[in-house]
Amino acid sequence: LFIFMGTGIMALAIQCIFEPIGLVTGGFSGIAIIIRKMTAGIVEGGVPLWLTNLALNVPVFIAALIIKGRKFLGRTVIGTVLLSFWLYVIPQVDLTQGDYMLSAVFGGVITGIGIGFVLLAKATTGGTDMVSALIQKYVRHYSVVQILQVIDGMVVLAGLYVFGLKPALYAIVAIFITSKVSDALMEGMKYSKAAFIITDYYKEIAD
């Protein structure tokens, strides 16, 4: 259920907030937006986002199968297919009417919630978030979200080249908000309590 909801929320942000104004916030979806823009003059409307998302994930799936095993890959395949499905069925509507700040804030919050839901299900939607999860296996002192920020930054630089400075700057704002929201969602689901008991009968309690 978390994967289903998370991918739907993410696709909504991509299709109806980020893509209409060229806001490249990272991920394979960001790369897909760039490819769509660059192929618009070759293919009518450019290469569809859902198609690019699926195509880019194939080599990552192979790596995940080797490193994480079938169980992790199974969840990730589901996430990737669902995200591509949502990107296919959700119509492109500019919800923010070209407002960059609203797109960065609103889109960042929505994307953060979506990513958080998917990660809570111990899965990813493929792409750079799956790459981040694989890398985190070897650098555990960094969170998946922190690693994701670095990779997404590289994608944003590519977006800077294609779409210009203004969208890239707002994309950075969106990425920051996304990371904070997804981190808060994940940490908020982890509950632990510590109790300090002061007593003269510590030996009896210890036994």
Language-model segments: residues:
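Core subunits and conserved enzymes of cellular information-processing
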Residues: 1-202
